[in-house]
Amino acid sequence: MTSKNSIQKALYLAFERLQWSELRDSVPLTLSEQDLENLRGINEKISLSEVTDIYLPLSRLLNLIVKAKQQRGLVVDEFLGQKPSRSPYIISIAGSVAVGKSTTARILQALLRHWPEHPKVDLVTTDGFLYPLADLKRKGLLQRKGFPESYDMKMLVEFISAVKSGQPHVKAPIYSHVTYDRVKNQHQTVSQPDILILEGLNVLQTGLDSPVDTRRPFVSDFVDFSIYVDAEEPLLKQWYKERFLQFRSGAFSDKKSYFHHYSTLTDDEANTIAANIWDTINGPNLQLNIQPTRERAHLILQKGQDHLMSHVLMRK
């Protein structure tokens, strides 16, 4: 059986942290410590040095790739004798629960906005495309939330298709982590951005992963560049438990929170419940649906202790 390391060696160029940081090539740091504080997720300790070493080289790479795509688009438009199209460059960010996808997405959005070639960068999370809570309960999917079948994939594909085709105003549903549900009558409007960052658990899936219909379009069909944020599962489980403890005294303390009943748990009780949620929901979803898509990504960001990036793998 082919090992993970041999597959990655065949498909990717591997960079140690120091090697990758040297590819920054004098790109200026445009974020302050306060900016970074506003971008951090729960239980993340990301520093400006992490931005400098990892994210600035990545923003430079993406800028070069987007510019090349824009130039190619102009050539095609000239060949066809048509006006320049407004199709955005779409970047997807995938990975496990608690790995830090959202923080990675927010930092990249902030950095990419500072490049003059693509100042308009929108960010959409796939959480909003989860079926409403009532539908999940009716379908018996509440304990499968986050699994592929818990998403309204038809709505998500229609959204990403409309954005990709250059429609002027496309609405995406908004998700509340307080109510654990879609927010009724509220939407995020995406209006012809230069770049759209799409962040979610299952954005790398293809027809190979669907036992139902391998012929229907998938989100990955519309993505130009994909990133997978990776870490070993014991670290992910620990980060999830730590985040759960922070939510207990934070978001869960809100009386409107779906998980308000967790706010009075002791540390031991909270750790036990978080571990059980991981073992029965998040862990199996990672093993069955998320991790198997990792080697489809154009770039893998490998995290170690304290959420620090240790390696970067880039498709050959």
Swiss-Prot record:
Binding residues for ATP: G95, S96, V97, A98, V99, G100, K101, S102
EC number: 2.7.1.33
GO CC aspect terms: cytoplasm
Main location: cytoplasm
Keyword Transmembrane helix: no
Annotated signal peptide: none
Gene Ontology molecular function terms on file: ATP binding; pantothenate kinase activity
Assigned protein family: Belongs to the prokaryotic pantothenate kinase family.
Protein name, UniProt field: Pantothenate kinase
Species in which this protein is naturally found: Shewanella baltica (strain OS195)
Encoding gene, per UniProt annotation: coaA
